[in-house]
Design a protein with these regions (language model features):
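A gly/proline- and charged-residue-enriched helix-loop-helix capping module
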Residues: 133-150
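N-terminal secretory/targeting leader peptides
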Residues: 20-136, 154, 159-377
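C-terminal motif of bacterial Sec signal peptides marking the signal peptidase cleavage site
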Residues: 15-18
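Hydrophobic alpha-helical segments, principally membrane-spanning helices and signal/leader peptides
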Residues: 2-3, 142, 249
Length: 377
């Protein structure tokens, strides 16, 4: 337990800052970490239920389980959260309401599923041609991003903590090669996200909705010509390369992503401070772990799918990429002009970029990285 707490306190220096300056972060520092339950018999035994938008065995669900495991470890087993995969307690599209109403105490989600309630939730879960996973991480922990989550979920009687940050998705997997916008215009494609759907419509691309569980069969039967799911390791888990060998990358429609845990505010307020600290610390540790673990698995799956499974990577020309980029920004600016909540989140993201982009440009290849080629040997 001592070693875990030392690691937890170290991870806690990542911090979860509030909106505004990093100095006003309210981060989980060593003083707060000491308030985590360290085996005190004075603290109550608490049991929660945690639903999920993810199915059993899905990598995202394993992250939900890891979060719950950490909460239990940090409280010496006095606070336990039992995980239930999608469909066990409720359908994925019911989870938000179940947590909001207190039917269950918490739920693991991806905010884009709640875009029908408010499009601001989509920005909290992914962006088109904008934030990378590392951008999300820095924005949430240092740039005031966490407060945007609290503000939005707080409107629905919830508090929220990110527990998993994803890097850019794989791209579109298709049964025919995609090398241009024109190619996509002649296809029926599964694409997630309200904003991505609007951008696709402006680009003349025919988008359809297909459940992730039906994606393999839909591609196999020709119901759709292409589709996206997630990052390489998640795509590999569905074996999409067996029915769609072409792989158009990068994923302009989802350049990074965030999963988290929704917590009913009444249930949260009933917890002793030590258990609230344990939840926050578990979320910080889980986010840090998954940021590297998930990308490492993507490295391995990409190599496998290209070298063993015969996937063929295609790219579009720069003019088409520029058209897509400009269209994505146009969609965002239009939504920000008509949705105050969306604008609140979008403005915070733009403030972050204003701070980050100057130094990012100076770093060039030495910032987010580059690949060695023959000229570098």
């Amino acid at each position: 337990m001592a070693s875990l707490l030392c690691g937890a306190i170290g991870a806690a220096t990542l911090g979860l800052s509030g909106c505004g300056s990093a100095a006003d972060s309210g981060m989980m520092d060593a003083a707060n970490a000491n308030a985590v339950a360290g085996g005190s018999s004075d603290l109550p035994v608490v049991t929660w239920k945690m639903g999920s938008t993810w199915g059993d065995g899905n990598i995202h669900f394993t992250c939900d389980e890891r979060f719950s495991e950490l909460v239990s470890q940090l409280t010496d087993g006095r606070f336990t959260i039992t995980n239930y995969p999608e469909g066990s307690l409720c359908a994925a599209n019911q989870l938000f309401d179940y947590v909001q109403n207190g039917t269950i105490q918490c739920g693991g989600d991806w905010g884009g599923y709640w875009s029908g309630k408010d499009t601001a939730f989509e920005l909290l879960s992914t962006t088109m041609d904008n934030f990378t996973g590392m951008d999300y991480y820095i924005w949430i922990t240092q740039g005031g991003g966490l407060q945007c989550y609290q503000d939005m979920y707080g409107k629905y009687n919830m508090t929220y903590f990110p527990i998993m940050i994803n890097h850019a998705e794989s791209g579109i997997r298709s049964t025919r090669p995609i090398t241009s916008i024109k190619d996509m215009q002649s296809m029926k494609i599964r694409l997630g996200g309200v904003m991505a759907g609007r951008a696709a419509e402006k680009l003349g691309i025919n988008i359809t909705t297909v459940a992730a569980s039906e994606l393999y069969e839909s591609l196999q039967r020709g119901v759709i010509d292409g589709g996206e799911f997630s990052t390489p390791c998640s795509d590999d888990s569905l074996k999409l390369q067996e029915v769609a060998k072409y792989w158009c990358s990068p994923a302009w429609y989802q350049s990074g992503g965030v999963n988290g845990v929704m917590i009913n505010k009444d249930a949260w307020n009933q917890l002793p401070e030590e258990y609230q600290n344990a939840i926050q610390m578990a979320a910080e540790i889980c986010t840090s772990e998954q940021l590297s673990r998930y990308l490492w698995m993507d490295f391995e799956s990409t190599k496998k799918m290209l070298e063993e499974d015969g996937c063929i990577v295609t790219e579009m020309n720069q003019d088409d990429w520029n058209t897509i980029r400009n269209t994505c920004r146009e969609v965002y600016e239009e939504e920000a002009a008509q949705n105050e909540n969306f604008n609140m989140v979008y403005s915070s993201m733009k403030d972050y970029r204003e701070k980050a982009d100057t130094y990012r440009a100076m770093l060039g290849d030495y910032g987010w990285g580059f690949n060695y080629d023959d000229s570098a040997k």
